[in-house]
């Protein structure tokens, strides 16, 4: 039996979609929340029997929020369909507020036959600790039911355009900064939910053998510390990892290196004028262009010091050597990762599930050899 839908919208106007699903991280005057949803029965064919839109306001009572409207409707309908398993997907213009996140977490705990994936265009009050904690509770994986939350990227915006927008036959045209904003929001959500790296991803990409093949990605793990009473205090809210963005005709046509994604992220933190130390652990040392831009950043931000530990040196010939020298000359500390840095990354950024770091054969020897090469590069100021 098909469900009876109330308080829903069949399709939204194109202007409504572009205005409300703008993924610019900081926006004002977006007080209406749009929630597009799909409900599928879990099984081999997984037919979609519900695909509609709820709309609500940010500031009235929580019962007026679209998440609460959906839960009210779905709970009533589920009373007649308790035995069926469902997969629910939301596409929302704002991530849930604290009360909605708590209500959704309670709903999932009460109804383990329902799985929920939430794609969000923007993060609501992501800098407030109570909002951060509510989303962590909603998405925690401690063996119980939880939601999966992701940032909308091109494919999700395209899907919403096709399924929920009265496009009048016109194709979806993404905003120019959609991929850059996605990268910022994706990294911020990773910080907020404390995402960790798969162990295989870490050991494959951070292996410090001097010659490797097939590893085109760069991973960058980072942490931020603030000076307080002559000691460095770790800021847990600014800790995570990034990787380079592959070339994408819908996003970055030429791709975007992890270091540049990281530089995009730092202003988003809105650091004050106190002294900060930023430490990066990278699978490859920066290329010439990235090194130059990182050097420009620290030369302008005198209150931010930068430490870079690289697992390997990226093609250290010619201009790339000069890029590292410029970065070093402008005040960055550059070093090769040794056992202690690999172990720290494993303990801090990897989903190790209690397993200790196991060094691979030749780790120390490779680290010593790479350190010698790096010293030669940095000391060769005349070339």
Swiss-Prot record:
Residues covered by the CMP/dCMP-type deaminase domain: 29-138, 214-327
Broad enzyme group: hydrolase
Required cofactor(s): Zn(2+)
Binding site for Zn(2+) 2: 257, 287, 290
GO biological process, one term: cytidine deamination
EC number: 3.5.4.38
Highest taxon, organism lineage: Eukaryota
Record site: Interaction with DNA: 244
Catalytic site: 259
Residues covered by region (Essential for cytoplasmic localization): 1-60
Listed GO MF terms: cytidine deaminase activity; RNA binding; zinc ion binding
Catalytic activity, reaction form: a 2'-deoxycytidine in single-stranded DNA + H2O + H(+) = a 2'-deoxyuridine in single-stranded DNA + NH4(+)
Family: Belongs to the cytidine and deoxycytidylate deaminase family.
Domain notes from UniProt: The CMP/dCMP deaminase domain 1 mediates RNA binding, RNA-dependent oligomerization and virion incorporation whereas the CMP/dCMP deaminase domain 2 confers deoxycytidine deaminase activity and substrate sequence specificity.
PANTHER family found in the cross-reference section: DNA DC-DU-EDITING ENZYME APOBEC-3G (PTHR13857:SF20), MRNA EDITING ENZYME (PTHR13857)
Function in brief: DNA deaminase (cytidine deaminase) which acts as an inhibitor of retrovirus replication and retrotransposon mobility. After the penetration of retroviral nucleocapsids into target cells of infection and the initiation of reverse transcription, it can induce the conversion of cytosine to uracil in the minus-sense single-strand viral DNA, leading to G-to-A hypermutations in the subsequent plus-strand viral DNA.
Designated name of the protein: DNA dC->dU-editing enzyme APOBEC-3G
């Amino acid at each position: 039996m098909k469900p009876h839908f109330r308080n829903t919208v069949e399709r939204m106007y194109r202007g409504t979609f572009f205005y409300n699903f703008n993924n610019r991280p900081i926006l004002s005057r977006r007080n209406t929340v749009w929630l597009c949803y799909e409900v599928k029965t879990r099984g081999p064919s997984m037919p979609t029997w519900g695909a509609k839109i709820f709309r609500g306001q940010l500031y009235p009572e929580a019962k007026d929020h679209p998440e609460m409207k959906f839960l009210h409707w779905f709970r009533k309908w589920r009373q007649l369909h308790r035995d069926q398993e469902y997969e629910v997907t939301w596409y929302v213009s704002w991530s849930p507020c604290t009360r909605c996140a708590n209500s959704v977490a309670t709903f999932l705990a009460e109804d383990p036959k329902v799985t929920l994936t939430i794609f969000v265009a923007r993060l609501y009050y992501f800098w407030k600790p109570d909002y951060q904690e509510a989303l962590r509770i909603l998405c925690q994986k401690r063996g119980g039911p939880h939601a999966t939350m992701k940032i909308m990227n091109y494919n999700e915006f395209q899907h919403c355009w096709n399924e929920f927008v009265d496009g009048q036959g016109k194709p979806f045209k993404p905003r120019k900064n959609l991929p850059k904003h996605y990268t910022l929001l994706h990294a911020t959500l990773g910080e907020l939910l404390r995402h960790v790296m798969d162990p295989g991803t870490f050991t494959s990409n951070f292996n410090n053998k001097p010659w490797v093949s097939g590893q085109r990605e760069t991973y960058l793990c980072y942490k931020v510390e603030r000076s307080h009473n002559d000691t460095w205090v770790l800021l847990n809210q600014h800790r995570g990892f990034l990787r380079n963005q592959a070339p994408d005709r819908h996003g970055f046509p030429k791709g975007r290196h992890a270091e540049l994604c990281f530089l995009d992220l730092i202003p988003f933190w809105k650091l004050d004028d106190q002294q900060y130390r930023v430490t990066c652990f990278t699978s490859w040392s920066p290329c010439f262009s990235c090194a130059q831009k990182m050097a420009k950043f620290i030369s302008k931000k005198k209150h931010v010091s930068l430490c870079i530990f690289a697992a390997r040196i990226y093609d250290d010939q010619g201009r790339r050597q000069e890029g590292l020298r410029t970065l070093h000359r402008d005040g960055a500390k550059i070093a090769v990762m040794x056992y202690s840095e690999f172990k720290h990354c494993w303990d801090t950024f990897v989903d190790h599930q209690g397993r200790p770091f196991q060094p691979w054969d030749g780790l120390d020897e490779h680290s010593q050899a790479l350190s010698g090469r790096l010293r030669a590069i940095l000391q060769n100021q005349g070339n």
